[in-house]
A protein has these predicted regions:
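Conserved beta/loop motifs at nucleotide-recognition and modification sites
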Residues: 1-158
């Protein structure tokens, strides 16, 4: 029941002042389960919990998420963390950050908290590693599953 209430609260926050909830809104929030796993994975990366990071990754693979899709979500999340960290460092409030990077207001606080676990340099390195791996996968120079594993290991080891 608690989970359902949380999901409804997210949905209400996501649609804001609109009077109608669309199927698009529901799709966006349903895909949040995978995004939530990525969020947890980034927490584990920040804490250098390599085994947990890889377990989360393999769980996503078991759920039929593609490594390339996981990489895209990881890159997106790292980009958002970087943007939030930069705007927070400039003293912007949550509402302004929400508008500037076009994410729901409820997500800004979580991203701010998580961004504090990373330096700007580490986030930049992660974004660059994701872009490089994306290129290597697309050009056939590395297997997608291995490419993502290498990034996860690189950033979660002590």
């Amino acid at each position: 029941m608690h989970t359902l209430k949380n999901e409804l609260d997210k949905l209400i926050s996501y649609v804001g002042d609109r009077k109608e909830i669309t199927s698009y809104d529901l799709e966006q929030l349903t895909s949040s389960q995978t995004i939530n796993q990525i969020f947890i994975m980034l927490d584990a990366i920040a804490r250098k919990q390599r085994d947990k990071v890889l377990t989360l990754y393999y769980d996503l693979i078991e759920l039929k998420e593609s490594p390339f899709g996981i990489l895209a979500l990881l890159a997106r999340q790292c980009n958002q963390l970087l943007q939030v960290k930069n705007l927070d460092d400039l003293g912007k409030d949550n509402g302004t950050i929400s508008k500037e990077i076009k994410i729901p207001a409820f997500a800004v606080g979580k991203l701010k908290d998580q961004s504090k676990m990373f330096s700007i340099e580490v986030l930049l390195s992660m974004v660059e590693a994701c872009a490089k791996t994306d290129e290597l996968i697309k050009t056939g120079k590395i297997n997608d599953r291995v490419g993502v594993e290498l990034i996860l290991i690189q950033f979660s080891q002590n």
